[in-house]
């Protein structure tokens, strides 16, 4: 999509003024890339930033969903517990069970997501430990995430998770190390920019955009780019780009209609022309 967009912009370069930046968002699936893009400073002088994500439409047609939201702030992290191995039958008292520490931490984290201010989520998606059935496990690793409908809620749930990890490690005499693997903030698109994009869709594609509210229910680190531009006085917007889809998200049979790539590039190029086109 980004290559097609760049080529389209190059072909209409004489009609543009100012500076148009085409930014690749790396490691989006793990919400690991956008923050580093923001820290580079490339967005500090940007007046408008647009991003999108493919989504499924009910009839499989190409569509633009402009009224998007529900981006959950999130933290992704790995935890390694270290204990001490010993013989499970002959000298279990000499061991420090890292598997039990990780299991207790998992149970504790999963029960601390309630928040009256909004939505909270926690998931431990992977737990590995041990070397054999007759060995007290000396090491355990879990991969987890916390989420919240606002950055504040997400931060509190993450803090509760860290408390659970620390307490579980102490209970079983283990040490632990937390490695942050990614994250995203919550954000809101600017209404004025959304209206511009909707008119571009009508004028350039000859179709009516889907303006019904669509909440993501997941996380998207493009929100860091949105916030960076907004904090510098600019406008930001994220949209869903509808197409047909096979298999559910994160399913091994997942696939999508690739015609959405050209469709999306036309939208982005048309928006750039509307926002940065020459007026004389």
Spans of model-derived segments:
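Histidine/acidic-residue-rich, glycine-tolerant segments that coordinate divalent metal ions
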Residues: 1-5, 9-126, 131-137
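Metal-dependent amide/peptide-bond hydrolase catalytic core
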Residues: 99-280
């Amino acid at each position: 999509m980004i290559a097609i967009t760049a080529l389209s912009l190059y072909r209409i370069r004489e009609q543009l003024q100012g500076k148009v930046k085409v930014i690749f968002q790396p490691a989006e699936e793990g919400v690991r890339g956008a923050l580093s893009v923001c820290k580079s400073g490339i967005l500090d002088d940007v007046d408008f930033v647009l991003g999108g994500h493919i989504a499924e439409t009910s009839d499989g047609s190409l569509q633009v969903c402009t009224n998007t939201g529900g981006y959950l702030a999130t933290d992704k992290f790995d935890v390694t517990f270290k204990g001490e191995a010993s013989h499970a039958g002959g000298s279990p008292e000499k061991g420090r069970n890292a598997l039990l520490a990780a299991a207790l931490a998992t149970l504790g984290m999963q029960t601390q997501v309630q928040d009256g201010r909004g939505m909270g989520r926690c998931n431990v998606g992977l737990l590995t430990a041990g070397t054999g059935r007759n060995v007290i496990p000396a090491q355990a690793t879990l991969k987890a995430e916390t989420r919240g409908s606002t950055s504040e809620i997400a931060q509190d749930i993450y803090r509760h998770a860290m408390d659970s990890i620390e307490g579980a490690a102490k209970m079983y005499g283990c040490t632990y190390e937390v490695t942050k693997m990614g994250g995203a903030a919550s954000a809101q698109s600017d209404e004025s920019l959304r209206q511009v994009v909707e008119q571009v869709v009508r004028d350039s594609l000859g179709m009516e955009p889907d303006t019904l509210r669509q909440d993501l229910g997941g996380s998207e680190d493009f929100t860091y780019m949105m916030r960076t531009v907004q904090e510098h006085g600019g406008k930001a917007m994220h949209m869903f780009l509808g197409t047909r889809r096979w298999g559910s998200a994160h399913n091994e049979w997942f696939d999508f209609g690739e015609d959405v790539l050209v469709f999306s590039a036309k939208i982005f190029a048309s928006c750039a022309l509307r926002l940065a086109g020459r007026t004389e």
